[in-house]
């Protein structure tokens, strides 16, 4: 059984290992820790039964917009629904924080992630040319509009 929870400072090593396993140009451990500790950020982790971090997600809150910065699942644990669970939970948390719009970027070649985001209500709204490096690639901007809380 896995646990989905808010990230703690003590999770930084696990988050960093996921970052290195998933991204060709990973954030440094220091950058991740700095980001984790800022008040207007939300971070989640997926923790395995043995306590190992197998995924994480991060977001920034800017005015009434949430920017999902990273969603990463260790390659050995992909296709098990953890990415969708984290995205749903992060979306709920951003909504509770008053965010009216949520944005993210995804590599144009990452068809699986795009399909997941579409299933969760995100739509493509633009392209950031040469947004990614190693390899250089465009980033598809996807957005989700949040309904008002009743």
Predicted regions and their residues:
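Extreme N-terminal starter segment of soluble prokaryotic enzymes
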Residues: 2-3
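Acetyl-CoA-dependent GNAT
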Residues: 6-76, 87-89, 93, 97, ...
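Conserved hydrophobic beta-strand within the GNAT/NAT acetyltransferase core sheet
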Residues: 68, 102-106
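Active-site acidic-Proline motif in GNAT/NAT acetyltransferases
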Residues: 74-80, 108-110
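Conserved acetyl-CoA-binding loop-helix of GNAT-fold acetyltransferases
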Residues: 79-93, 115-119
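Short glycine/proline-centered loop/turn elements that form peptide/ligand docking sites
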Residues: 83, 87, 110-113, 130-135
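Conserved catalytic-core motifs of GNAT/GCN5-like acyltransferases
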Residues: 105, 118, 123-140
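Terminal substrate-recognition subdomain of acyl/acetyltransferases
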Residues: 136-150
């Amino acid at each position: 059984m896995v646990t989905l929870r808010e990230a703690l400072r003590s999770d930084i090593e696990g988050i960093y290992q996921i970052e290195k396993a998933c991204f060709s140009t990973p954030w440094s451990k220091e950058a991740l820790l700095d980001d984790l500790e800022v008040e207007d950020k939300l971070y989640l982790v997926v923790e395995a039964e043995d306590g190992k971090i197998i995924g994480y997600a991060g977001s920034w809150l800017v005015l009434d917009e949430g920017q999902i910065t990273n969603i990463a699942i260790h390659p050995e644990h992909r296709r098990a629904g953890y990415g969708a669970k984290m995205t749903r939970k992060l979306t709920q948390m951003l909504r509770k924080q008053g965010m009216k719009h949520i944005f993210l970027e995804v590599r144009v070649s990452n068809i699986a992630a795009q399909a997941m985001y579409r299933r969760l209500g995100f739509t493509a709204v633009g392209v950031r040319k040469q947004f990614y490096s190693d390899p250089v690639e465009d980033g598809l901007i996807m957005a989700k509009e949040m309904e008002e809380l009743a």
